[in-house]
């Protein structure tokens, strides 16, 4: 009957074709941001919840980490202010931040607040920073920060315990320092700090 034209053919679904990866060419061009929930097994107080906010510069892989006890748009906005200042002290101007579609970052999938910017989005706008959202349910588009979290699990959370937010923050800062000084294959076995220093020298 379809051949006789008695039923309309269903429109073929448009196939998603991934865009080629955009390689960053200088520090601060795009920074991936995400949140890692600290494993319960690492926290001494059963009532305490801890979260690691992570920013990673796509070009240099230089990371900034911060400890929070809430995963919400207020924490995200505070983290954005801190990461911008932290990178600026190292000579990097953040132009764009890339996140997933979590409610701590955007109201994109909120039924009632879809057209209302979150505090994170409002802060990005105030700071003149572009906020890019990845394709829904596609964490690989934030692959650098996702891979860094797997390294955190292996090198940090598998062998550390935390008794308070302050204790977690102190240990996380030490872990960040080690991470930024660790050689990386994508950087030709330079650490993020060394790679950034070599770029600055070449750019002069």
Q: What residues fall within each predicted segment?
A:
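Basic, flexible linker segments flanking DNA-binding modules
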Residues: 1-40, 101-103, 109-121, 196-200
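C-terminal domain-tail junction helix/linker
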Residues: 10, 29, 122, 127-129, ...
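An active-site-proximal beta-strand-loop segment
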Residues: 33-64, 74
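Active-site beta-loop-alpha junctions of metal-dependent nucleic acid enzymes
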Residues: 48, 66-93
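RNase H-like polynucleotidyl transferase catalytic core
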Residues: 98-101, 113-143, 161-163
């Amino acid at each position: 009957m379809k051949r006789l034209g008695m039923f309309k053919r269903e429109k073929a679904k448009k196939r998603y074709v991934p865009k080629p990866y955009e390689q960053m060419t200088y520090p601060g061009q795009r920074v991936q941001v995400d949140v890692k929930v600290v494993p319960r097994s690492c926290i001494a107080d059963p009532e305490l919840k801890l979260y690691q906010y992570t920013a990673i510069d796509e070009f240099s892989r230089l990371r900034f980490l911060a400890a929070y006890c809430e995963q919400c748009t207020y924490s995200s906005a505070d983290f954005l202010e801190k990461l911008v200042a932290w990178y600026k002290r190292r000579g990097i101007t953040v132009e764009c931040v890339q996140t997933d579609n979590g409610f701590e970052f955007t109201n994109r999938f909120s039924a009632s607040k879809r057209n209302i910017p979150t505090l994170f989005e409002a802060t990005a706008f105030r700071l003149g920073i572009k906020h890019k959202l990845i394709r829904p349910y596609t964490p690989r588009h934030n692959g650098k920060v996702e891979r860094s979290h797997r390294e955190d699990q292996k090198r940090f959370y598998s062998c550390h315990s935390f008794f308070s937010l302050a204790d977690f923050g102190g240990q996380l800062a030490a872990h960040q320092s080690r991470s930024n000084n660790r050689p990386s294959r994508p950087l030709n076995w330079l650490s993020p700090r060394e790679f950034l220093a070599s770029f600055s020298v070449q750019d002069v």
